[in-house]
Swiss-Prot record:
The gene is grpE. GO terms for molecular function: adenyl-nucleotide exchange factor activity; protein homodimerization activity; protein-folding chaperone binding; unfolded protein binding. This is Protein GrpE. It is found in: Cytoplasm. Participates actively in the response to hyperosmotic and heat shock by preventing the aggregation of stress-denatured proteins, in association with DnaK and GrpE. It is the nucleotide exchange factor for DnaK and may function as a thermosensor. Unfolded proteins bind initially to DnaJ; upon interaction with the DnaJ-bound protein, DnaK hydrolyzes its bound ATP, resulting in the formation of a stable complex. GrpE releases ADP from DnaK; ATP binding to DnaK triggers the release of the substrate protein, thus completing the reaction cycle. Homodimer. It comes from Bacillus subtilis (strain 168). The keyword Chaperone applies. It comes from the Bacteria. HAMAP family: GrpE. InterPro entries: GrpE, GrpE_coiled_coil, GrpE_head.
Amino acid sequence: MSEEKQTVEQNETEEQEIIEEQAAADEQQEETNESELLQNQINELQGLLEEKENKLLRVQADFENYKRRSRLEMEASQKYRSQNIVTDLLPALDSFERALQVEADNEQTKSLLQGMEMVHRQLVEALKKEGVEAIEAVGQEFDPNLHQAVMQAEDENYGSNIVVEEMQKGYKLKDRVIRPSMVKVNQ
């Protein structure tokens, strides 16, 4: 019986080893499945993180572009803030210049003209401080960006496409034309 008992014990031991091996294999399989599941979750979270980082970079770039655009618009607004009032003042300046061309024939008229010249100078200086300047025309080559041709002439003293006469002064505010010069151009 001892042999039988030994065989039974050996069988039980073998069964126990098989069960333990099976349990170890099952445990290892569970660990592998759990490891794969965790790795999949990590990969998914890394992809989500990368997507969010890219979105954040785009939002930051959009915000920087918005700030730059706002700054440029503000600078342009400051630069040309006086354009409307200057445009409204130009006809008055033209009238002043026409009035100053009248010849004074007595002391009262001369005195009045001197006063008007002082006011005219002050007005021109105030406009210069704002960046307004007259556009040079006579003797210059015709430039459609600066001049408006209203007449043509044939004058041998001037070359082709040269401004011969200025009918109305043109003005620029900083680098922007607010009124082109009305000119007569040589053919």
